[in-house]
Curated annotation (Swiss-Prot):
BP GO annotations: cell division; cell wall organization; peptidoglycan biosynthetic process; regulation of cell shape
EC number: 6.3.2.9
Molecular function in Gene Ontology: ATP binding; UDP-N-acetylmuramoylalanine-D-glutamate ligase activity
Entry's family note: Belongs to the MurCDEF family.
Name of this chain's protein: UDP-N-acetylmuramoylalanine--D-glutamate ligase
Gene (name only): murD
Protein species of origin: Aliivibrio fischeri (strain ATCC 700601 / ES114)
Disulfide bond positions: none
Pathway where this protein functions: Cell wall biogenesis; peptidoglycan biosynthesis
Keyword Nucleotide-binding found: yes
Role played: Cell wall formation. Catalyzes the addition of glutamate to the nucleotide precursor UDP-N-acetylmuramoyl-L-alanine (UMA).
Statement: the UniProt record of this protein carries the keyword Cell division: yes
Compartment list: Cytoplasm
InterPro entries according to UniProt: Mur-like_cat_sf (IPR036565), Mur_ligase_C (IPR004101), Mur_ligase_C_dom_sf (IPR036615), Mur_ligase_cen (IPR013221), MurD (IPR005762)
Amino acid sequence: MSGFGGVKNVVVVGLGMTGLSVVKHLLKTTISLTIKVIDTRDTPPGHDQLPENVELHSGGWQQDWLINADLIVTNPGIALASPQLKPAIDKGIKIVGDIELFAWAVNAPVIAITGSNGKSTVTDLTGEMAKAAGVKTAVGGNIGFAALDLLEQDAELYVLELSSFQLETTSTLKLKAAAFLNLSEDHMDRYQGMADYRQAKLRIFEHAEVCIVNRDDKQTYPDVEKTLKSFGFDQGDYGCIEKDGIEYLAKNTVPLLAANELGLVGKHNIANSLVAIALLDAAGINLDATLDTLRTYNGLTHRCQVVADNNGIRWVNDSKATNVASTLAALSGLQLEGKLHLLVGGVGKGADFSELSPALHDLNLMMYCFGEDGDQFVSLDPRSLLCETMNEAIATLYPTLNKGDMVMLSPACASFDQYANFMARGDAFTQLAKQYSIES
């Protein structure tokens, strides 16, 4: 708890699941603290769960609280560049996030994953593999449980997904191993450019014993000398080799598992599996005990998930594809018998969607564009239709469906124009898929 030296007044900025986990954690410390919460929303989620001795200011900022704090704990959604935080920064007040508080408190090994795409799958898969090896494992961070809530599980190993937003306010997190999966354009509404975004991601390596990088994406390599292990589709530390005409996932030249035995489909999931293997190997976990999980694991909800399959028509929920690279990954692994009915759109976060054009050109498809930035997709391909909502898009495409077709939601955008989050968007798609499948 060394980070709390001299701290008496703490201001938590942003409530919700993460903010509540911070308040709960602070109340458990042995130090006597005055805790106050600021949330710009009029009725922030979780406000009714705050204890009476924690004061809440909602509906705007409270500058007096901020400049008189000893420590400010910000929600990942609050950028450090926010002008409201500048007076506190200028005054030298320490600003951290929930992951930094986790770093001060954790007393078991931690491994962590970041990247533009695939990090949720790798985090979840790594956790499942560790559990299969008999290790008491807690999984969370930017996925599932807030990191501070995981401490209650008293785990032997913590597996964290970390976003660039979380890493901005994290500086002392010691990791047995850290993986930087890939880097592609995302969150350009938050960062000044790709270099700025990359630097936020690279913070994951600051105190990592082993840094796992992507041989096919040199942007994932740290700028300073570190202990590196790499993954890729060629032979290397962790890669692919061919033996007797069969492709294997391998550690150096040692085959571990045939690629066709993986429960996950798509080339990108070979890479995801290699990262999980590399992380667990670095953490000293017996790989032999984990490989069966690779055979049975079939992925996350909202990530290339078949939610309905009726009359030869498959409905695929890929709502977690909130950027262009995620949608490109989904399209690259498709096996189509008929036409693809692709649903795209939402909040584009300043992204350049033109990268999708070559992938779209090679597919038998019709694209339905909806949401705040749906109009930005229409010019990418002449086989496009602009709709107000996803409901309207599905009602429009449904009468045209034939056996062998696929309806895929892979929006390449954030969801918060029309939905609370990507999960709510995926749930809405799943409900519509099941409804229309019954009717067909």
